[in-house]
Amino acid sequence: MHILIIGAAGMVGRKLAERLAKDGHLGGREITKATLHDVVEPSAPADAKFTSTTLASDFSMPGETAKLVAGRPDVIFHLAAIVSGEAEQDFDKGYRINLDGTMQLFAAIRAIGDGYKPRIVFTSSIAVFGAPFPEAIGDEFFTTPLTSYGTQKAIGELLLSDYSRKGFFDGIGIRLPTICVRPG
């Protein structure tokens, strides 16, 4: 199985790559190749039982996502994001990475066609809910983002759902509560 991690140089991406390298399997299938991508070249995990390729580019630039999915990865972890504070401070950059990059990735997968239907794991955020919200958030709770970042992630979730509904890929979204930008 070929795995692609977009955002592999970030904290979550590094931890994920290390865990996959340690396990060597995902969902009962052996990992044979990993492509690790970020805006800066990520490190390949040590002692991986599979081949790792590391790439650096801005995935929101035209044509970059097509290059990333050309190898037809079976599972794509889309972890790349401009976090909330920076997305608020630099409106254009937030939308370019968090929304345009996501849209280009999904469109590049769709453009391959020919029965290609990877599993997409999209990381979202509780920022899609705004505030205040209850301690336990049920499926019926509406998304009402109060920030540009929350809006970008909410739109990403809707796109993920629609592309999955149309059968272009098998998508799953994970809403992360809070991510520390730097470990420690």
Locate predicted features.
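Conserved Rossmann-fold NAD(P)-dependent oxidoreductase catalytic core, especially the SDR/UDP-sugar
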Residues: 103-147
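Active-site helix of classical SDR
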Residues: 148, 152
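N-terminal Rossmann NAD(P)H-binding glycine-rich loop of SDR-like oxidoreductase domains
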Residues: 1-26
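Rossmann-fold cofactor-recognition segment
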Residues: 48-62
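NAD(P)H-binding glycine-rich loop region in Rossmannoid oxidoreductase-like domains
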Residues: 59-97
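Conserved cofactor-binding/catalytic machinery of classical short-chain dehydrogenase/reductase
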Residues: 61, 75, 101-104, 141, ...
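Conserved beta-loop-beta element that borders a ligand/cofactor-binding pocket
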Residues: 157-182
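SDR active-site strand-loop-helix element
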Residues: 6, 37, 76-80, 120-126, ...
